[in-house]
């Protein structure tokens, strides 16, 4: 790796990813050509056809009144990147797609903790997708580009950060896999990290992981592939580190040549040391007692009361610095919570480090829903609701991603009352979209195939109460609701949120000497406070046999691999416990709700699709109106027929089969037909859709001569007829059948006994 000046002021660094027999991928970072007025700008290329621009800018002055770091990450998908015109009414890009929002989150999560504490200048990172090979994904390239442009901008940033997707394909972890290669993968994960100096030399500190089993994982495992167990996932994290190191090195080399000098940005610490010492002196004892209260509401009420007392006692001393007092009180709370966990292995609600809160699960809680369930873990309460519909109700996706439709849609709602607060209610925020996507990824690997279950599925997770990991609660509630709706899942899935607390603890040896020891404590089923005050948020979902989804964010500069492996093992123990509780509520698919549509799949020849639809949809619309069934036809000839009752669906199927899969009537067959046309020489009678026969005028009079057909029959009349002859051209001659001579085999024209099966 080296940096080349490809023209004056334009520099390029290259990273080569060697995947052995799976080939190589080349990532190039170029700066100096585009977006020259941004603080830092990088054009990133993946091989030759993938190109995106990342630009980082900073405001000139800080937002002193902010008590948070104002970092904004935006991903702009340009449809010209794929040679397409947007499908919206105005034919231009509008609100960001779900893929773009999820990529924003992937970038934000490792970038945010890498800035200096107390920074209050607005920082904006804008990533624009300029060109995309349809066989590649842009999200991981965007992480690297955002890191590189930020590294060049002269900001107080402790990068660079490398991001890589690794997929387990044929037993090998492949970096930057193509969409085609991912179809053969059992597991893939996006891993971001940075280079650090470890005790044993240079290392890579993992900062963020977003991982999932693929949709066909069970079929691949049945075919002999390695299941993504906890051990395999831990190996994948280690396999990602060399690739991250290569990417970080390329970014750093580019920064060494082209980065602006780091500017002196003012920082605003949350509180001064004097404020902290004062708060600690007046609050430590009482706050320690308050943090042993088990119930969240009672504990919060007592800590709020203590905080008000501290503010009142220190009001005169620190007049005008009330925000600092509040921040110091929070910092003291964090210290006491962590201290108790590390020294006593007890948590603020009295549990041990591996204890799970009280669990409850029930199904069929919403009367008219197709499937519903209520899952509760402690004070976290999730209502899962499943809706089934025709496949044509699948989501249509207009984005740069490889998906164009989505049959399974998981929507997560987090109303403000779930935490006892007030707030805005409306369109989902990025957090809600991210949580819904995580729960969706956890469940996709166990969903039945379209052939086995021809439905579009919408799963909604309502977070009714929140105190730690509503996303993993959503996985559990969704599994229950899907089974209640009659969805034949391949295996039930449960999720659990883990946490990690670490610090240097003073320990005393046998000879009385004291030393500092780095201690890591992994927590099972973390509370909201433990999430906020801990060093790692680690969510794992899976079946009893393997992991289906994983999300990790850490604030540490490295977690020992044995600690991570232990956390995965601890998470599996918890997952198995939760699965047992869920199985007590429901352990196999229920009968489908009477309110859910019954969808039947049939196939018609592709060349018959036009006949089934008819001119301007005339035939299919008539079938829909007359039978009450909903019909959806795919390009390959698959027809989905849905109705809330069996007879309606069967009537529609019979009508479609009569057109597309007709069985020719035979001489001697009898029908109850409808007169559709009269002429001077006879009456045409409809036997089957698209199949008429003629009763000659000489046969209408029952042996008597008649002058005019209309004297005997009119259009719309029902006639019992028998096929007397079928000529070489397929024309059918009919004769009337006497009522008293009609045999039991007489069949309505819509469903002749010998013409359907």
Curated annotation (Swiss-Prot):
SUPFAM superfamilies the UniProt entry points to: Eukaryotic type KH-domain (KH-domain type I), Nucleic acid-binding proteins, Polynucleotide phosphorylase/guanosine pentaphosphate synthase (PNPase/GPSI), domain 3, Ribonuclease PH domain 2-like, Ribosomal protein S5 domain 2-like
Reactions catalysed according to its record: RNA(n+1) + phosphate = RNA(n) + a ribonucleoside 5'-diphosphate
S1 motif domain segment(s): 668-737
Keywords of this entry: Cytoplasm, Magnesium, Metal-binding, Nucleotidyltransferase, RNA-binding, Transferase
Main location: cytoplasm
InterPro entries: ExoRNase_PH_dom1 (IPR001247), ExoRNase_PH_dom2_sf (IPR036345), GPSI/PNP (IPR014069), KH_dom (IPR004087), KH_dom_type_1 (IPR004088), KH_dom_type_1_sf (IPR036612), NA-bd_OB-fold (IPR012340), PNPase (IPR012162)
MF (Gene Ontology): 3'-5'-RNA exonuclease activity; magnesium ion binding; polyribonucleotide nucleotidyltransferase activity; RNA binding
One GO biological process term: RNA processing
Cofactor names: Mg(2+)
Pfam families linked: KH_1, PNPase, RNase_PH, S1
Binding residues for Mg(2+): 531, 537
All residue ranges annotated as the KH domain in the record: 597-656
Superkingdom of the organism of origin: Bacteria
CDD domains to which the protein is assigned, alphabetical: KH-I_PNPase, RNase_PH_PNPase_2, S1_PNPase
EC number per UniProt: 2.7.7.8
GO cellular component, one term: cytosol
Gene3D superfamilies: GHMP Kinase, N-terminal domain (3.30.230.70), K Homology domain, type 1 (3.30.1370.10), Nucleic acid-binding proteins (2.40.50.140)
Family under the similarity heading: Belongs to the polyribonucleotide nucleotidyltransferase family.
Protein's job: Involved in mRNA degradation. Catalyzes the phosphorolysis of single-stranded polyribonucleotides processively in the 3'- to 5'-direction.
The name this protein goes by in its record: Polyribonucleotide nucleotidyltransferase
Species in which this protein is naturally found: Mycolicibacterium paratuberculosis (strain ATCC BAA-968 / K-10) (Mycobacterium paratuberculosis)
Gene transcribed to yield this protein: pnp
